[in-house]
Design a protein with these regions (language model features):
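Alpha-helical transmembrane segments of compact multi-pass small-molecule transporters, enriched
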Residues: 16, 28, 51-55, 107-122, ...
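Transmembrane alpha-helical segments that form core, pore/gating elements
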Residues: 56, 115-117, 153-212
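Membrane-interface helix termini and inter-helical loops of multi-pass transporters
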Residues: 30-39, 94-98, 145-160, 206-225
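Specific alpha-helical transmembrane segments that line the substrate/conduction pathway
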Residues: 43-54, 83-84, 89-130, 168
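Juxtamembrane helix-loop-helix junctions in multi-pass membrane proteins
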Residues: 23-54, 94, 100-102, 174-198
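Loop-to-transmembrane alpha-helix entry segments
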Residues: 68-72, 76, 105-108, 124-145, ...
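Hydrophobic transmembrane alpha-helices of multi-pass small-molecule transport proteins
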Residues: 56, 78, 117-118, 128-150, ...
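Loop-to-transmembrane-helix transition segments
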Residues: 13-23, 58-61, 65-93, 108, ...
Length: 225
């Protein structure tokens, strides 16, 4: 096998994985929309975060890895949890009670643009080029075409909810930048650690605010978890 052939196959595999990731990420908004139909936003996100965190802990154990125990790193996990799960997940779930899943996907696709802007302001050592700006704008336009530009028809009718999704997107951008501080760790560790911290915040909030034992969620909402 030539080096060029191997490189082409690697690129194809990476593009396939990227496509799968984009599909799963986009579908998550549909699942959230189904979930909040009968489950309050905080409880829905608490359950999803608990499930995701538990799965990652199992993966860690399966790989023979353990989470770090230092106080400093867990404070960083906690901060990352607020940026990457607690605040944005809850905002999106709350907003999707009135915003269509397609429009939520499009609004969230602005995350690379906010990452670009925040990087330009706070991470001065990275070059900001027209090529990068073109890339993120082209990516957002591509998502609009995939989801369907008709989803933009609801833009402006539920402004507060839509702004909540944009705020969540800015949180994701901040999380992407802050996540670079975990370079010394295996990527699964900050993911698992931050989800566990998010669970520790969201589950008590759910118990206090929603009293989930009194809820009667639909089968569709439960499956959306």
């Amino acid at each position: 096998m030539t080096e060029g052939t191997a490189g082409g196959r690697n690129m194809a595999a990476e593009l396939l994985l990227l496509g799968v990731l984009a599909t799963l990420w986009g579908a998550s908004y549909t699942f959230i929309k189904l979930g909040v139909a009968t489950i309050p936003p905080v409880t829905l996100i608490a359950a999803r975060t608990l499930i995701a965190g538990s799965l990652l802990v199992l993966v860690l154990r399966g790989r023979g890895m353990t989470l770090p125990r230092g106080r400093a790193v867990w404070l960083r996990f906690l901060f990352q949890a607020c940026l990457n799960s607690v605040v944005p997940f809850t905002l999106i779930a709350w907003a999707e009670r009135s915003v269509d899943a397609g429009l939520a996907t499009i609004l969230n696709s602005t995350s690379p643009i906010f990452t670009f802007l925040l990087t330009a302001v706070f991470v001065r050592h990275e070059a900001v080029t027209a090529r990068k700006l073109f890339g993120v704008v082209a990516g957002m336009l591509g998502i609009c075409l995939i989801v369907g530009v008709e989803a933009l028809g609801g833009f402006g009718r539920e402004l507060v909810s839509q702004l909540a999704i944009v705020a969540a997107t800015i949180c994701y951008a901040g999380a992407a930048i802050f996540g670079r501080s975990f370079k010394g760790l295996d990527p699964i560790m900050p993911a698992a650690g931050s989800l566990l911290c998010g669970t520790a915040i969201l589950v008590p909030a759910s118990l206090l605010l929603d009293r989930p034992w009194l809820l009667a969620p639909s089968t569709a909402s439960l499956l959306a978890l």
